[in-house]
């Protein structure tokens, strides 16, 4: 984009839009055009994908509930394709402030000082995807942020002042898609912090509350069986996740073979030298299907669809 100042942006007719409305608008256009919304996802055409489309149209935060290897994260990543290619942000903003309606004190200060001369940066949709694997050692500082005592002392500011906060991943993902994988593994107190962001539009750091209306599309993933024995989703947070979508393994061997063929990474030279009979491919996939119903395999942790190793055998 050639627009570089706030004045030019206003002249272009740009209007502020939430990320959920942006996703909804672009998804509606894709559906009207009869195009495929999620590419290279097999076996979900009549189950998971329609539910995901409805969740996006409803403006919900989403939780994918399923076992390992069921394309939960891949679906979340492909939601990026439903974002606008470029969005404007205030140059120098830490949390991707919208030039028309900034939410951070720094963004507001820049607009106040420079007015229409405020410089504009542009962010590509591929940069608007954040992902965090939830583990028990993830802290509030990692996700939400922490107070910077050195900054507070040097600027002579109170700890309750927004300017002394070093923002974590979630505030920096403002106007982006934020994925939390394995949500139940997050400590309960951090899940409560997420609840505050979803419900109250405020962040809490070391007892200080700060109201910042963050604009984020949250996507969570979780396993239906708590095979990690580490925790669960706290009820208040669960109630604020608008759509819970159950994923599943391929329902037929043909779909499983299609996934394996797509995911296997075989060089052109190897393809010339190696021939894998169809019956061998069927047998490998059949082993997966049998394992999922076998009493000798712990089905709670899932039998992944990632059976691509046989394609590399010599």
What residues fall within each predicted segment?
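Structural motif
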Residues: 43-44, 300-307
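Conserved ASCE/P-loop NTPase catalytic core
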Residues: 1-252
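Conserved small/polar residues in nucleotide/adenosyl-binding loops
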Residues: 311-312
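Short functional linear motifs
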Residues: 49, 191, 238, 271, ...
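Conserved C-terminal "switch" segment of AAA+ ATPases
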Residues: 16-24, 230, 244-303
């Amino acid at each position: 984009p050639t627009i570089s100042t706030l004045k030019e942006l206003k002249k272009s007719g740009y209007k502020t839009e939430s990320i959920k409305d942006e996703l909804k608008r672009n998804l509606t256009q894709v559906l009207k055009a009869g195009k495929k919304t999620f590419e290279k996802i097999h076996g979900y055409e009549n189950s998971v994908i329609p539910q995901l489309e409805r969740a996006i149209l409803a403006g919900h935060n989403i939780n994918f509930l399923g076992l390992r290897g069921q394309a939960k994260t891949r679906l979340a990543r492909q939601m990026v394709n439903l974002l606008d290619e470029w969005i404007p942000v205030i140059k120098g903003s830490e949390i991707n402030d919208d030039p028309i309606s900034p939410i951070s004190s720094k963004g507001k200060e820049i607009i106040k000082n420079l007015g229409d001369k405020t410089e504009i940066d542009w962010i590509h949709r591929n940069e608007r995807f954040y992902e965090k694997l939830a583990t028990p050692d993830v802290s509030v500082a990692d996700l939400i942020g922490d107070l910077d005592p050195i900054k507070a002392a040097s600027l002579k500011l109170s700890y309750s002042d927004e300017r002394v906060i070093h923002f974590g991943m979630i505030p920096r993902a403002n106007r982006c898609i934020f994925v939390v994988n394995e949500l139940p593994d997050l400590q309960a107190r951090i899940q409560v912090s997420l609840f505050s962001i979803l419900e109250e539009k405020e962040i809490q750091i070391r007892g200080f509350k700060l109201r910042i209306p963050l604009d984020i599309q949250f996507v969570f993933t979780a396993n239906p069986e708590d095979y990690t024995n580490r925790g669960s989703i706290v009820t208040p947070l669960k109630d604020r996740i608008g759509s819970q979508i159950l994923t599943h393994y391929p329902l037929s061997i043909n779909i499983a073979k299609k996934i394996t063929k797509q995911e296997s990474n075989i060089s052109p030279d190897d393809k010339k030298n190696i021939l894998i009979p169809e019956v061998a491919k069927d047998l490998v996939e059949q082993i997966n299907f049998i394992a999922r119903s076998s009493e000798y395999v712990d089905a709670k942790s899932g039998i992944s669809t990632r059976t691509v190793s046989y394609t590399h055998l010599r």
